[in-house]
Amino acid sequence: MTLIRGSRPRIKVLLAALVLTAGVGGTALVAPSPGTVAEQPAQDQRPAQDQQPSAAPKQSPAARAPKAASYPIGGYFVFASPSSSRNTQKLSEIKTAGADTVITFGTILAPATLATLPKECVIDGVNCAKAAAGNLEVNRYFTYSDGSVWSSQAVKCPQDRRITSQGKAFLVLVLPAQGTGCTSTNGKYDVVVAGGGAAGGMDPAASLALAATKLGMKFYAGLPLPVKRTDTAYLPDVSYQGTLTLFTERFLQYQAATNNVKGLAGFYHSTEMPVTDGHTFDPILDLYRMQNQAIHRILPTRGAIVSPYLDARVSAFSISLTEARKGIRRIAQTASGLVLNIAIQDGMGTGKGGAFQSNEANSAVDRYAESIVGKGSWSSKYVAPIRDYFLAAAAGISGTGAVLWANLEGMAPATASNPCGDSLRGQSSKARIDRQLQQLSNAQKIISFMWDSYYTCVGTGVPLKAQVESGIATPIITDATFDASTGQVRITGFNLSGGNAQVKWTTKAGQRLEKTVKPTSTNTAYGVQSGMNPELEMILVNVGKTTLAAGRYYTVNVTNQWGAENDAFYSQRVYTAQSSRDAKG
């Protein structure tokens, strides 16, 4: 996910949940269960642990209690502003959209020379880095241009300086090139010039943390990161790993001293890698491990987020489901004692992933994906749908202590029809976002890249944030099963409760039937009980004993207690008659 800079929302849109019915056994299966043999992509080697629960959890009084409508996206990437009022306004809007978490990207600790250091940073007319180092032997110079206003509490060593020059505030750190503390064991030092914010201004990260605290929200601050290698652009430059380690510790010590507020929930790793087990990316895993250890040592109650990316394109890197399962486990093993939230990017905004259902496998990709992968069907362009990758990831992360999140890409590949300001990506729509959400139900939290500016830009239609706010109560169906022998239909998703469900199906005799019925049971705690997204609900409806024709789809629509109908296309995998009998037994 590279940091680069519609249609009118509808509450009531008819959209079907299509599920291919099973044959002889009489039970239409949607979610896999142990022993089920389904049509799978060639690389799907998912073990039984990947499967979602098939039995309805036992209800409790609390599970039946009604709850307010909420959109499944629980957090957004944002830009921090030095203006406290702007940060508060932005977080208030995000909270109105149903989220409680914001994340910022980190700043690069970049190698520099005396000539490339900020011209405004001077002490008595002398370059501030040169003046701070004095007679010490300088190994390398660096910049950390975060635009912040570091306070005097960042000054720890005798040569460190906090200065105001030409209307800007800078911090100069003199770090040992070898060893720890303030004194180098080889007599050489690295000098870092940080900050550059307006003198007398507010530190953006501190302002955002205070706003989050005031609003009862969570803020994850971006960690320092290295530059990329010049020969291999997808790997970090580890030639100054020691300097980055020392600077990370000083950065975290400063956060502990000045920004240790309730709203600061943890930190974000901005260096990215694919969800794969390839050892090529070991330097990135080493970086995660180093910074996680530092967080846990200095701020032991804080967690971290890392957001690896998918690439399911057949014509590209093509991460397999097995690689994703093993890859997330390797990332989880870098946690080093803290709570590590692994938010996999779904790839829909960059065209690297496909949110499609089984009955769409042979259908043409949408125009946004087509702009990246070309014309063709979903199954010919992508190894597997996003949902399969998250099932594999859930199996891989199991038992590690890390938490599976999802990073929903809130933009779309750019075309002539969906400009988003001056961004290189295009504006998406809530209907497309809802399709993505259907694939992510087993992630315990869903965050999205990014509020600024993909949710706020004025493109060809209504800004995405307005679409989300007006459609916050929309039901989103994530799964359904139909047991024809009892007539019970089990539906899971978001914002399902309090209304009714419409079921359409074809019997073995070829008769088309339709019923609209109220739920016989509602479990608003289904997600919590199942270890999936805590906002997930489950409803049971009964249409009476019947039969289901083999090879035919049944449809399910939900109207909830707010009168809203699902507005995202839904279907599931193709199952054989034999698989139905096996699973039923």
Where are these regions (language model features)?
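Short, compositionally biased P/S/T/A/G/V-rich stretches that sit at domain boundaries
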Residues: P308-A312, F356-Q357, L464-S485, Q578-G585
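Substrate-binding cleft of secreted/luminal carbohydrate-active enzymes
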Residues: S83, K90, I94-L114, Y144, ...
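A short glycine/threonine-centered beta-strand motif
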Residues: Q488-S497
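N-terminal carbohydrate-binding accessory modules
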Residues: E39, P61-G98
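Ser/Thr/Pro-rich low-complexity tracts
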Residues: S497-T507, L513-G585
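Active-site neighborhood of glycoside hydrolase catalytic domains
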Residues: E249-R250, H279-R313, R325-K326, A335-L338, ...
